Design a protein with these regions (language model features):
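N-terminal beta1-alpha1-beta2 module of alpha/beta enzyme domains
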Residues: 1-95, 219-222, 344
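Internal, glycine-rich beta/alpha segment that forms the wall or movable "lid"
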Residues: 3-4, 111-240, 267-268, 273, ...
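Hydrophobic faces of well-ordered beta-strands that scaffold small-molecule active sites
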Residues: 5-9, 54-56, 101-105, 130-134, ...
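Active-site mouth loops of central-metabolism enzymes
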Residues: 23-36, 105-113, 220-231, 284-286
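The substrate-binding groove and active-site-proximal loops of carbohydrate-active enzymes
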Residues: 26-33, 74-79, 102-110, 151-155, ...
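Catalytic cores of nucleotide-enabled group-transfer and carboxylate-activating enzymes in metabolic
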Residues: 62, 81-84, 91-104, 226, ...
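Short, conserved secondary-structure transition motifs
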Residues: 277-291
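Conserved small/polar residues in nucleotide/adenosyl-binding loops
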Residues: 358-359
Length: 360
């Protein structure tokens, strides 16, 4: 049986997602992100184009590592302003039948008990088309604005995430038995208390004694995405994820990443072929190669170098403003997204990376 290619669109509820500066293009529509029709039109387009899903990114905080402030991110609309992604799902589901939705939501700042209810509600309303991109927040600005002095250390964030998932699994899978909902009009009994159980979770980070507030949804546990590519992040993905998102900058890096993920999945006792790996690709289309190249060059003319530096500085925790554009990158261990540094500076030794480009 031939293997299928799965296609997810990649969006964010903001003006500038991963192409900072393109909002200034005269044909750009991203400033309409505040309008419901923008999102329902996109959902219809993706369904008509046979896409499998729409993956919606998110951050809670601003990119303020570059020059020690958020001015570049704000002036260049580098993922700010940014609206909540969750509210987009239901209206897009209402105008489609098959399109899946991957919701990015950080577990760093929300207790699993109310979050479980949100996910189950979305699973009901989408009729089983919701997925969750499990992320641990990495922006220090987000932690500070929620009363924390700093983020947890990188690997500790995944320890916290492991327990978070255990609470959710207990709520989704163990609280309500199959057949707990009776809807018995004659006896006037809606649910059987004997088939609904308290989870009685007591752990290092959470104590959740009660039952899940939602009756079982179509999937119970939504499809789990994971985008961490550090060693600890890949171990977490191997234990939990059904879909792994990577952003490999070369075929060499991608081959290494996929092989490593599948090996770790097998070591975790799971079937590695049942874990889908999605790689980030930016595709520019044209009727001919020449027209596609011309369109690409046109788009590049709007690139904001300052906005791009704000993003990569936030992703890595390194102020790239201190480097020359032609300065070679070296591997640096940071507490932000470790994989962002590893991919550029150590994963592919055949390439030399600078702040602007790579050289073979």
């Amino acid at each position: 049986m031939p293997r299928e290619i799965r296609l997810n669109a990649f969006e964010m509820n903001c003006v500038g997602h991963q192409s900072p500066g393109l909002w200034a293009h005269p044909r750009d529509r991203s400033s309409q992100y505040k309008d419901l029709e923008y999102w329902t039109d996109l959902a219809r387009l993706l369904e008509r184009g046979r896409f499998d899903g729409l993956f919606i990114a998110d951050v809670l905080g601003i990119y303020d590592v570059l020059d020690g402030n958020g001015d570049a991110a704000i002036s260049q609309a580098a993922q700010v302003p940014v609206n909540d992604p969750l509210a987009l799902i239901t209206p897009m589901a209402a105008v489609t039948r098959h399109l899946g939705f991957g919701l990015t939501a950080s577990l760093s700042f929300e207790h699993p008990y109310p979050f479980a209810r949100r996910l189950s509600t979305l699973d009901h309303l989408t009729k089983g088309r919701i997925g969750w991109n499990v992320v641990t927040s990495y922006l220090e600005s987000g932690a500070r604005n929620l009363g924390q002095q700093a983020q947890l250390d990188h690997d500790r964030r995944y320890d916290y995430a492991d327990e978070y998932l255990q609470v959710l699994y207990k709520l989704f899978e163990g609280s309500w038995e199959d057949g707990a909902v009776l809807r018995d009009r004659r006896r006037r009994i809606f649910s059987d208390p004997g088939k609904i159980h308290e989870i009685r979770h007591v752990g290092e980070h959470f104590q959740v004694p009660g039952i899940h507030l939602c009756e079982p949804s179509p999937q119970r546990t939504p499809v789990l995405y994971q985008a961490g590519a550090s060693s600890r992040g890949k171990r977490f993905a191997a234990e939990h994820a059904e879909c792994v998102f990577v952003a490999a900058p070369s075929k060499t890096v991608l081959k290494q990443a996929v092989a490593d993920i599948r090996q770790r999945v097998a070591e975790a006792g799971r079937d590695p072929r049942k874990v889908l790996v999605f790689n980030l690709q930016t595709v520019v289309l044209g009727e001919t190669d020449a027209k596609a190249r011309a369109k690409f060059d046109e788009y590049r003319a709007f690139v904001s170098y300052e906005g791009a530096l704000a993003l990569i500085s936030g992703w890595t925790g390194i102020d790239f403003g201190q480097y020359r554009p032609d300065q070679v990158l070296r591997h640096i261990h940071t507490n932000a997204i470790q994989s962002a540094v590893e991919e550029f500076s150590s994963a592919d030794p055949t390439r030399t990376w600078t702040c602007l480009v790579y050289t073979s």
